[in-house]
Amino acid sequence: MTLTIKIGTLNDSDQSAVHNGTENGSDFRKITPTEEEICDDVVLLWKEEPGTEDATIQHLYDRITERNQSWKLSASRFRKILNEHHLYDTDLETVSLYKDKIHFPKALDSDAKVEVKFIDDEHGRGLFAKRDFSKGQIILKENKPIVYIPPLDKLFLISNGKACARCGKALYDLTQHKIMVHYLDCEVCKAIWCSEKCKKAHASLHELLYHSWRSNRIDILHAGNWKRFVNYCEKYCFTAAFSVGLIYGSMLLDTTGEVKEQWQKLASISQRERIKLRDASGIGSTFSLLNGTTVHTEEESDNGTKKGVEKNIDDETVWEKCYELFCGAFPKASEEIDFEKFLTMIGTFNINQYNGQVYHWISFINHDCEPNAYIEQVEEHEELRLHARKPIKKGEQIRITYVNPLHGVRLRRRELRVNWGFLCQCDRCQNELSTFERVPNLEKKNADANLGVEKIDSNDNSEDGSKKSTGNRKSSMREAQPDLKEILKNGKEFELDIPETVDTQGNVRKTSVRFDSNVSVAVDER
């Protein structure tokens, strides 16, 4: 028996056919991408390869066309779209912000360790230390959020008794004996709580939302309409609207008025204002998925029946339908909450939430790219502990970071601008920005000059071919990387730099494992 090694191509990757203009025997035609598709892929590229956030526009164009070889996209249109969507602003100081439209209530608060002070109209309020704190010391604890919001993607498991009705914790280790002994299940539906603590905190709200007919509370909530509202939020991943519904329902049940009082102390902004600064809407969006800014799509066909073709739905349409269902669930809601106030409640949740929950003290803490404090989550993401990252003096403002501290200055500021409406002016940002100004990038000047003389052609009549850039400026983040141990304490996602190598022509490339369309096969020749 003789074995022969033969090399063939994967059956779904005939590269020669693509380059020759045909694929599987049929004509291969390039498609013109939409502005949304271009923006989404640029932001996704920045997420996947943080080093490209500071690349020249020519290098960025080369990477995008390399990733999407089926696109018909000219360099002039690419630059025009990025400028219009503020994805390649040379001066971020000139872009739109919504910080001036955020309303800061005058309400203040304090305890033995910290106090809330009003800073000014631009910065609103901040949390200040009332005593000295050493590095690593716990500044404060928040045992629970204003209202606990279960993860939207776990509602199916919750409705089938596979996850806790309050916190969403999986119930695989909860025995039937324990459920019966501690009465952890609902008498009417399949809902189960993971502990007596969760049931005590959530049972009354669950009764109102899903079984209001039992307690004669139909006048304030219609259980059937509540399910329709929740289903709609699930369909469009509208976490903020779902959260607002739970918070409003808790306000109706709270005889002490504490929930409403804490909610009214939060900084507020309409979601309509926030959505104007969205730079992309797909998987690569700078906007957080939690912030209710995912692409709204529905499946339909020409005859109206559901089919596997997706159609984008306007944000306004989703908001209006969601508000209609919200008022259907809460019959008296329209008397005090109109459509614009509903959007303000959504925006308020988004700018104050921390990992999907709204906490009283945490909502007052401002941002800094080199914070003096960090947050630790314990007990299934319910309790928060605020630790001192460095020594804090009495009267000093306590700050945390809102964004990934390992990102470059441009990406950090872009995320802050889009998600919270301001540009960070901290010392670290200023130092990194000054580094860009001090170190001129000749490649960028040349690329910008070449693209600047192009006539802007939105119809993509210009040639797409262009020379590859020969290098890429390193992210300024590498000049001021925080200590890794400190980053881990922040409990936030971060990315590690990938080593770079230089080839014989001086081109900078990422070290990686390469895969192609070839496959080796051992053939038995008899």
UniProtKB/Swiss-Prot annotation:
Pfam families, per the entry: SET
Record EC number: 2.1.1.-
Extent of Basic and acidic residues compositional bias: 476-492
Domain of life: Eukaryota
GO cellular component, as recorded: chromosome; cytoplasm; nucleus
SUPFAM superfamilies: SET domain
Paired cysteines (S-S): none
Residues recorded as bearing Phosphoserine in the entry: S517
Coiled-coil segments: none
Region (Disordered): 450-492
Keyword field: Chromosome, Cytoplasm, Methyltransferase, Nucleus, Phosphoprotein, S-adenosyl-L-methionine, Transferase
InterPro entries, A to Z: SET_dom (IPR001214), SET_dom_sf (IPR046341)
GO molecular function, one term: histone H4K20 methyltransferase activity
Function: Histone methyltransferase that monomethylates 'Lys-5', 'Lys-8' and 'Lys-12' of histone H4 (H4K5me1, H4K8me1 and H4K12me1, respectively), thereby controlling gene expression and remodeling chromatin structures.
Protein's UniProt name: Histone-lysine N-methyltransferase SET5
The organism of origin for this protein: Saccharomyces cerevisiae (strain YJM789)
